[in-house]
């Protein structure tokens, strides 16, 4: 029966992680909701895992005293116990408001085979036995919490077990005699099993499951320099209909994590329970990512003449600029130009019902490439555009795509006189549409992972956009090995 305990991680971890100390108490950036439908699916999968596990274990030996008529009191031993077959019919996993989860298994039976010995001072009997255990019922309440590291905790707050019937058939030396007193043997067998089931479950929760939870990573790698923080901001919340797990959801630079000035907004989640799981993802998650990529310089770019299409009317040369910036051509005749773009502040994604948008602002500095290989600054442009964003999610991650609008260019500073900066809009539009945004869309296509266990996939996906957050709904399929 120890497998009942060892199979608990298969049931629970598929729910708890379907997963910084200073973040405790803050608003979550990401919430995972497991509905009653999802809990029942987890119970079903857990029952299958348990049934498979039971057939691979050896039960512990147990001994005791037995009074045999005409022989007297002897010492019995049941050993080499193996589960030959099992049938687990019903299981349920329900939220317990304010506490955690209640796991129950009922109407189950197992058949155990093994060896027996009976010792008396002047003789020893031995043989084999076959035990049929019917009507097994187990109920365990699991208290869920979180520790300062942001990892989940679990304790078995209560446990009860019951066995309706035990039938023992013994063979071997005088096995027929012992079978005459099967009621006494079966009663002892039943008491031993009932007492050990909860003992082994509670031991497994404290010695196996809880230590395992402490090894779970609270960060997940996104790419070569960015990670996402999946630590819990508080203990999982259980209500009558669901279990909700709150994650920090901050994306940060792996090598030098800086304090984030952004705050995650309070998310008012829709009361939806039709799917197995839901994920609420705050704009905080995406905007902390923007801060990291801005800090890394990922948003900076440069444009040189060899990047301009051959049929362009404007080249990045002082000669090409002569018609509208004549002073530039006079001061720097027949020289090439380089445009260096940067984003002064990280662009923030705006969520409104049914819509995603971002309004990036860029500055572009123009340099003349001197014969000495040095660069001479000559003017600065400001570039504004509005961008619509599309986010989707698949079986394991969220991906995105940016669609930019038309750019608007203004001259901010100039050492070569005033000129109409709008003449550069066509050139900048070409670069932004064909190089700058494709680079970002390639990164967004890589996506960032949802807090799922291995071999867990999502299907029947649905996406809603609310103020300040995305709301994703899905059903779950566990891919068995």
From Swiss-Prot:
InterPro entries: Bactericidal_perm-incr_a/b_dom, BPI/LBP, BPI/LBP/Plunc, Lipid-bd_serum_glycop_C, Lipid-bd_serum_glycop_CS, Lipid-bd_serum_glycop_N. Disulfide bonds join 159-198. Keywords: Antibiotic, Antimicrobial, Disulfide bond, Glycoprotein, Immunity, Innate immunity, Lipid transport, Membrane, Secreted, Signal, Transport. CDD domains: BPI1, BPI2. One of its GO terms (biological process) is leukocyte chemotaxis involved in inflammatory response. This is Lipopolysaccharide-binding protein. The keyword Glycoprotein applies. It holds the Pfam family LBP_BPI_CETP_C. Belongs to the BPI/LBP/Plunc superfamily. BPI/LBP family. One of its GO terms (molecular function) is coreceptor activity. SMART domains: BPI1, BPI2. Glycans are attached at residues 300, 355, 386, 394. The keyword rRNA-binding does not apply. One of its GO terms (cellular component) is cell surface. Its main location: secreted. Plays a role in the innate immune response. Binds to the lipid A moiety of bacterial lipopolysaccharides (LPS), a glycolipid present in the outer membrane of all Gram-negative bacteria. Acts as an affinity enhancer for CD14, facilitating its association with LPS. Promotes the release of cytokines in response to bacterial lipopolysaccharide. Changing residue 333 to L: Abolishes lipopolysaccharide binding and causes increased proteolytic degradation of the protein. When bound to LPS, interacts (via C-terminus) with soluble and membrane-bound CD14. Detected in blood serum (at protein level). Residues 1-25 form the signal peptide. It is found in: Secreted; Cytoplasmic granule membrane.
């Amino acid at each position: 029966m120890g497998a009942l305990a060892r199979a608990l991680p298969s049931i629970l971890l598929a729910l708890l992680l379907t997963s910084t100390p200073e973040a405790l108490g803050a608003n979550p950036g990401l919430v995972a909701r497991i509905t009653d439908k999802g809990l029942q699916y987890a119970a079903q999968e857990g029952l299958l895992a348990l049934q498979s596990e039971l057939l691979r274990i050896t039960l512990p030996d147990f001994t005791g005293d037995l009074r045999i008529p005409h022989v007297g009191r002897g010492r019995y031993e049941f050993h080499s116990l193996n589960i030959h077959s099992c049938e687990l019919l019903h299981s349920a996993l329900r939220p317990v408001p304010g506490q955690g989860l209640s796991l129950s298994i009922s109407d189950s039976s197992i058949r155990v085979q093994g060896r027996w010995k009976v010792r008396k001072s002047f003789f020893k009997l031995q043989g084999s036995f076959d035990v049929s255990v019917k009507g097994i019922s187990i109920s365990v309440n699991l208290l869920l919490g979180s520790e300062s590291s942001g990892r989940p905790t679990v304790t078995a707050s209560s446990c009860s077990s019951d066995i309706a019937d035990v039938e023992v058939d013994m063979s071997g030396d005088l096995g027929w005699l012992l079978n005459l007193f099967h009621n006494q043997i079966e009663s002892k067998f039943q008491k031993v099993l009932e007492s050990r089931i909860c003992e082994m479950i509670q031991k497994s929760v404290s010695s196996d499951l809880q230590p395992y939870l402490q090894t779970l990573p609270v960060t997940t790698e996104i790419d070569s320099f960015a990670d996402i923080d999946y630590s819990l901001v508080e203990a999982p919340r259980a209500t009558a209909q669901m279990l909700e797990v709150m994650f920090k959801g901050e994306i940060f630079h792996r090598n030098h994590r800086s304090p984030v000035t952004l705050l995650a907004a309070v998310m008012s989640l829709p009361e939806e329970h039709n799917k197995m799981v839901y994920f609420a993802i705050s704009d905080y998650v995406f905007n902390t990512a923007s801060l990291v990529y801005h800090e890394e310089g990922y948003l900076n770019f440069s444009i040189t003449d060899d990047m301009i299409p051959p049929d362009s009317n404007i080249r990045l040369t002082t000669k090409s600029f002569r018609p509208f910036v004549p002073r530039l051509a006079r001061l720097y005749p027949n020289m090439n130009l380089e445009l260096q773009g940067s984003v002064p502040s990280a662009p923030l994604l705006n969520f409104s019902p049914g819509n995603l948008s971002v309004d990036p602002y860029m500055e572009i500095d123009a340099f003349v490439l001197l014969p000495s290989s040095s660069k001479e600054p000559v003017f600065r442009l400001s570039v504004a555009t509005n961008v619509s964003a599309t986010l989707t999610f698949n079986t394991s991650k969220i991906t995105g795509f940016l669609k930019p609008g038309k750019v608007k260019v203004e001259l901010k500073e100039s050492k070569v006189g005033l000129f109409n900066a709008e003449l550069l809009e066509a050139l900048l539009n070409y670069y932004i549409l064909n190089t700058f945004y494709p680079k970002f869309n390639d990164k967004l296509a890589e996506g960032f992972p949802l807090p799922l266990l291995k071999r867990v996939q999502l299907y029947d996906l649905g996406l809603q956009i609310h103020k300040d957050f995305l709301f994703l709904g899905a059903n779950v399929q566990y891919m068995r090995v």
